Amino acid sequence: MLLLGLDAAGKTTILYHRVLGKVVTTIPSIGFNVETCKVNDSEVTVWDVSSRGKIRPLWRHYYPNTQGIVYVVDSTDRDRMTEAKEFLHDILSEDELNGVPVAIALNKRDLKNCMTKEEMEERLDVSEIQKNRPCRVFLTTVYPTEEIQTELMNLFEWISEEPTDESQESSTKHKNDPFSSYFWTPLMKMKSMMFE
């Protein structure tokens, strides 16, 4: 599973909240974070990949084995909504991701001045995405209150139940080969870029 989105959207915070069950202090990701968490009685490997400029071209190395995408958007960042939309649609236009389910997390719902769900769906052109793949929108925060609920758990449960036939076949193939490029290609490519 890939965890993607613009920088500062809250990707890493969401990842470790899901893994550890609590909020931890994070710093901007330079390369990637990878963790395994239990979802619906299954072990799911989640790759949280930096969206910094030099790293973005490397995302394609993760695509062939992706069974689901979680795309995180900052609900308060009106100035970057066009960028967030373009980024999302560029990712989903890749051939390797045809039919892969995507969960869109409208994050930081605990903050003031959040855009409405309807406004964000329109600005991200969610209806267009839903024509070609399973896609759902979730309201998320790692600081829920009685008034502000979070759908983080529902998000991970939903996307883990929506694998494509192609991704299932690929997952089985690579599971039987622990030294396959599924693990090593992204790691080695990322390392070479980070130290250039």
Regions found by a protein language model. Give the residues of each.
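TRAFAC-class small GTPase G-domain
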Residues: 1-165, 194-196
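Long, low-complexity intrinsically disordered regions
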Residues: 170-196
